[in-house]
Amino acid sequence: MRRLLFANFAALAFVIAGSAIAADLPLKAPVPFAERFSWTSCHLGGHIGGGFGKKDITDPVQLAQDSFLGAGFTTGITTISPEPTGIVIGGQIGCDYQFASSPFVIGIEGAGSGSTMRGSRTAVLPLGNPGIALVQANTDFLPSLTARLGYAFDNVLLYAKGGVALAGDKFEVSGSFAATPFDFRGLDNRLGWSVGAGGEWAFSRHWSAFIEYDYYQFGHSNILMSDGINGFSGLVDVRQNVQVVKGGFNFHVWGAGL
């Protein structure tokens, strides 16, 4: 009996001592909760890319020939389509909001791009014995104001966008008619619309990189062309669109990871 009581007492003492030692040990730190990434922030940044445009110009042949010969001499309609290409470079500023407990993101962004897009085509002037005209079209700048809707996969955002856009264009029809030089020039700042899509990756708390495709449509309008050599003037109809692929970086002012 004594041995049994002693054994029970020893076991109880061992358990109590073990509990006391365990109570003195530091608690294991809790595993920190990983916060969900949020795209709610404002941003500013820069971009660079390439642009391709199509400009259907009607009718540079009639413009040149009828300026020298008088209205009605040119028969038929001629459309010349320079296709300007070049570099676009600029900046953007905007704000985004990600809905709570949701992957959906809405935002607004203003962007402006300078452009080196240039294109030219030649046209024959059959009544000029014959003559040749060089038809040129340039796009100098492309600002836009767009809304965007995105779907976030944590720190990766896929989005579509759309809004209003402006194109700053220059047009020139130059050459000679019956050995007489001419040089018609015109300017056009045209309002249109733009749609696009892209992807953005936030690689740190404040910085992200993106790639984007944009399509611009500016419809058609009449452009006044003036010849500074001979004092002629006339109208051409221009229908145009522009496509741009660009990439860039954004700095998120409030931190994309807030």
What do these predicted regions represent?
Residues R2-L258:
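Gram-negative outer-membrane beta-barrel domains
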